[in-house]
Structure formats: C-alpha cells, structure tokens
Regions:
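Glycine-rich phosphate/adenylate-binding loop
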Residues: 1-107, 133, 216, 224-470
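Glycine-rich dinucleotide-binding loop and its adjacent helix/turn
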Residues: 105-128
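Immunoglobulin-superfamily Ig-like beta-sandwich domains in protein ectodomains
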Residues: 112, 116, 166-168, 215-222
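Secondary-structure transition/capping motifs at alpha-helix termini
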Residues: 156-158, 200-204, 267-270, 322
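Glycine-rich phosphate-binding loop and adjoining beta1-alpha1-beta2 segment
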Residues: 161-214
Length: 470
C-alpha cells in the first residue's frame, strides 16, 4: 500500500482542494500500471485563537486508472503565464489587505485624498504632491506645523535639519515634541521630529540631521577645526538640497536663510519661505531660475516693463516664475549677524501662538498649488487683483507672496520682481558660488556685510543715493 501526503488548502469537510488533481494525473501517468490505488492524506493546518489544529485533515483512498493518457503527460491545470511568459501558479499579493499598517494607515490616508478627487476636484494630480521630496530647514514651531500639513497631503519623504535641542518651552507650541523629550538636556529637534513622524504614520520616510547652517557675518575661521566643520556642513546641505524637490526655509534668523537660498537657486529647486513677526507673517515662493541652457539673453537687470513676458498693463501683472524675487530681493543691505547685540530675551522669536500654524499651513498649500500648476515653479504669479479672475489651477490662485496681518485678520498677495543686485539670487552671486564653491562662501561667512554689498553693487547704489540726496 502506498500513502502520499498533500498539503490541502481546502476547508470542506468531505472534499479535497483542486491542487490534488494535478498530482492524481501525474500518479496515474507514472504508476497506473503498477498500482491499482493509493491512499491520500490531505494535510490541513490552521491556527485558531492561538491554538494550532490539524484535526480537520482528511484521508481517503483513490483508484488509479490504467495507462490511458498516452506517452506524454497532460498539462497541469490552474497555471497561467506569468509576467515573464512562463507557466506558473497565479499569485495574488494580499499584503495591503492584511498588513494593519498599510490597511489602516496608508489606505486611510490615501482615501481622504482620493475623496477630494472623486467628489470635489477631479483634475487634482495627487501624485505630484505625494511624490514630492521635502526638505525642512528648521524643526521649530514652523517646522512642526509644516511637517504635519505635509503628511496630510500624503507626502512620504520629509527631512529635517536643525541644530537646536528641545527645551521645556517647546512642546506647548511645537506639536511634534513631548515633555519627555526635554529631559536630560533635551533631544536634538531634527532627530526627535523625524522619529515622531514615523510614530504618527509608519508609511512616511523621515530623516533628521542635527547640524548647523553657516551664515553671513558668523565667522568660521577661528581654527582649522571650525573651518573644516563649516566645509562639511556646506557639503551636506548641498547634498540634501540636491536630493530633494522642495526646500522649506523655516529658521529663526534672516541670515540663516541666505546659504540655502543661494544653493537652491543654483540647483533650480523650488523654495518655499515662511517667516513670522509678532502678529504678521510672510509666506512666499522664491523665483525659480531658468535652466542654464535657456538663460542666454535673460538677466535680472532687464527692464521688466519692456519684456514680452509681461502681458498685463501693470508693472506687476503676469510676472513669470523665473522673474520673481526671493526673500532677499527687497533688501538694500547684505545679511549679517542679527543676534550680536541682542539680549537673550530678544533672540527668541515672539509671536502670537496661532500664527505659526497659519503660516505653516499656507506654506504647504502654496507648495501644492505650485506643483499642481502645469508650469510648476515657473507659473505666473497671482496677486490680490486676481482674486475675482478665473483661477489658474483647480486649487485656485498661485501667488508669489502671502503677507498676513493677524491684528486685522487680513491677507494680501503682493508680487515683487527679482533684484539684479540681490545678495542671494542675483547672477553675480550665483556665478561666484558656482565658480569658487566653498572658497566664495567662506569669504561671505568671515567678512562683514560690505563684501556682498560690494560684489552685487549695493555699495555703489548707496553712494549714488547719497549723492542724489545732496
């Protein structure tokens, strides 16, 4: 007597599963002349309420027919051609339906966004926002608010950069931190924020880098160690900006935004900037420079009123994205050390508690609106005058700046042109950076503000202004 065992996926009490058919045909073809019958054990294994059970397995005897199938074994049933064209069993990936992280987290997050498309905005391209890789420079009040809103839009790649540690005053204003994060000197903000995002939503890929960003007016030439560290920090920042699609500037001081603004302008990355006052804020997108091969014939110093790109009658209407100004374009002085003569209480950002959440949310919504526009960062800027016109995207306007005044509960949408003497995005600064790299940056860090002013022509502008006044 011959007994064979077969793993049986069927749960019926009196019948085996269909895979047994293939084996019975093979047995009849190979041993039909020698055996009249075989005993078959259909082994069934299941776990119910933590207890393993095989008592529902069945055993029975099968009579084998004589050799009546011919010399060739018939084709097996239940197999289909796979992606490579070969015959094999059809496999179905049920991980999304069985994995609680995917089922309850990713599917639910995606469902909320898809409902927007199905019910309200059918032309919304979610992939553009979900696939955006976002770099957050600053993990404080603004950084926490921006990160949470990015997750709401389904963004899967978020990276933090910050050099501070969590203090006892932070958790009440910065929602990614808890009281325990302040103990033992405080955890690094960037690392703690990245870890908290993973706990909030396991599907997000978040990283944190505890590092400083070199700044104009903050010398780094005290020793070879400080110079080497500055070079290392610059190289890391360049690498991070290069590997991300959108850069958020969310730091405390003005000068800390200069270096990432220069690097991002050189690498043609979309920059979203947010800054706070006590009851005012500004959220803006930096002008996105044209690709280098298309820049011939264009310069920031060209007369905007005579440009063929400006189709409107107003000087500030229909300005394309590559002619928009950056955070420093309205300055007539170079950035410097803004904390040198300030007391400790003056060095802290003091603003109304709800302001950061408003500005952070608008920063993310501005990013999404820009990405939804067919021209992306090169989209023509919308102004306050366009509020009654047909919006350029399914989500509405795509402004250059949003300036808010909480005391009046009012927002305005100004537009400003790129400044040919800008200390961050002008052609002279970008050319020097691209040609000399860190050597140029070191001069900016270690020199007074006059270095950038002399380079860009601001010093001459000051002299001409004084001469005109006289």
């Amino acid at each position: 007597q011959v007994t064979v065992g077969v793993y049986d996926p069927c749960n019926l009490s009196h019948y085996p599963g269909w895979p047994l058919r293939n084996f019975l045909v093979l047995a009849a073809h190979k041993w039909g002349d020698a055996l009249q019958s075989i005993e078959v054990l259909c082994f069934r294994d299941r776990t119910m309420q933590g207890v393993r059970d095989i008592t529902h397995s069945i055993i029975f005897e099968v009579e084998l027919p004589g050799r009546a199938l011919g010399p060739d074994c018939p084709k097996a049933v239940g197999w289909e051609k796979n992606q490579k064209g070969g015959m094999g069993p059809r496999m179905v990936n049920l991980s999304e339906c069985m994995d609680p992280k995917r089922l309850l987290a990713e599917s639910s997050v995606d469902l909320n966004l898809k409902l927007m498309c199905w019910r309200l905005v059918p032309t919304l391209d979610l992939e553009k926002s979900v696939s955006a890789k976002c770099l957050l420079l600053g993990a404080g009040t603004l950084g926490c608010s921006v990160a949470r809103t990015l997750m709401g839009w389904g963004v899967r790649k978020i990276t933090f950069v910050d050099n501070a540690k969590i203090s006892y005053s932070n958790p009440v204003r910065q929602p990614l931190y808890e009281f325990e994060d302040c103990l033992s000197g405080g955890k690094p903000k960037a690392l703690a924020a990245a870890d908290r995002l993973q706990k909030i939503f396991p599907g997000v890929s978040s990283e944190g880098f505890h590092m400083s960003i070199p700044m104009p007016g903050h010398p780094v030439n005290f020793s070879e160690v400080t110079m080497a560290q500055a070079r290392k920090d610059v190289a890391k920042l360049e690498e991070l900006i290069d590997t991300h699609d959108v850069v958020f500037l969310l730091m405390d001081t003005r000068e800390s935004r200069w270096l990432p603004a220069v690097i991002a302008a050189s690498k043609r990355k979309l920059v979203i900037n947010a800054a706070l006052g006590f009851d005012t804020f500004v959220v803006m997108r930096h002008g996105l420079k044209k690709p280098k091969q298309q820049e011939s014939g264009y310069s920031c110093s060209s007369n905007p009123s005579s440009s063929s790109d400006l189709l409107g009658t107003s000087l500030f209407s229909n300005i394309p994205g590559y002619k928009l100004g950056c955070y420093f374009c309205n300055d007539v002085v170079a950035p410097g050390d803004s904390t040198r003569d300030r007391t400790l209480d003056q060095q802290c950002t003091v603003s109304r508690p709800g302001l950061a959440m408003v500005a952070g949310a608008l920063a993310v919504e501005l990013m999404v609106s820009v990405l939804q526009h067919p021209e992306g960062g090169y989209a023509v800027a919308s102004s306050s005058d366009d509020r009654m016109n047909e919006p350029p995207t399914s989500l509405g306007l795509v402004p250059h700046q949003i300036r808010g005044f909480l005391s009046r509960f009012d927002n305005v949408l100004p537009v400003s042109l790129a400044f040919d003497k800008c200390t961050a995005c002008s052609a002279k600064v970008l050319d020097q950076y691209e040609q000399e790299g860190f050597n140029f940056l070191a001069k900016v860090f270690n020199s007074s503000h006059s270095f950038l002013e002399d380079l860009t022509g601001l010093t001459l502008l000051h002299q001409e202004t004084q001469a005109a006044e006289v």
